[in-house]
Amino acid sequence: MHEGRVVIVTGASSGLGEQVAVALSGAGAVPVLAARRADRLDALCAELPGADAIACDVTDAADRERLIATVIERHGRLDGLVNNAGAGATGPALQMTTEAFAHVLDLNLTAPFALSCLAARAMRGTGGGAIVNVASVMGLRSIGEIPDAAYVASKAGIIGLTRELASQWGRYGIRVTAVAPGFCASEMTAELGDDPEAFPEFLLARTPLRRGGRPGELDDAVLFLLGAGSSFVTGHVLSVDGGMAVR
């Protein structure tokens, strides 16, 4: 399903990005690992058959252009993009500076928009491709115990952006979708513990399945949205959250 397909994964040096890169490599794709930490990228790339690594700060316009140009130069095409790089600025809105708010939106929303545009220009000349944006359940609902106005705004924005780009780019054969993860065991959620069955009660109480996400569950969803099995799916936001968005 993914054999030989060239797919950029941003934020690939850790967490979900690393998991997706590993899954893509296992599916026969050519994952292009992009992140700022070159040492971690190189170490991961060495473990993954067919993988490539390009150090990149996605908030830097020149780095974004270099990333796409290097992929085309090395591989001749681009089949997929996973906009995964992101961060939060947890804290009450009244204590958050506008600079902190802007930084989160720059990384979580502006950078995916700009990189998607560059990717789309490359894809439309080769018959299309697939873009998967990593949103969040917090873009669909608020969680009072985790105040983060910047993160919530950015993830709600990426959901709207996903639908708009899907509408605009379908004519080029480019599908744009998103995953909206709940709380999954990863480096980003390390403070919650490494056992998704034993996450804090305030999260489990909001999750009909009464657990966090297990390793593999989220990257399986991303691979589905990138692949031929979702060839008639675009503009969709796939919640992978144990039902949290509906409670």
What spans do the regions from the language model cover?
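Short C-terminal tail/terminal secondary-structure segment
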Residues: 1, 223, 234-247
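Conserved glycine-rich cofactor-binding loop
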Residues: 13-14
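Short, small/polar-rich loop/turn modules that mediate ligand/substrate recognition or access, typified
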Residues: 82, 170, 175, 233-235
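Substrate-binding pocket helix/loop in short-chain dehydrogenase/reductase
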Residues: 92-93, 100-105, 199, 203
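Active-site helix of classical SDR
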Residues: 116, 154, 162
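Alpha-helical segment proximal to the catalytic Tyr-Lys
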Residues: 121, 167-168, 231
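Residue(s) in the substrate-gating loop at a strand-loop-helix junction
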Residues: 136
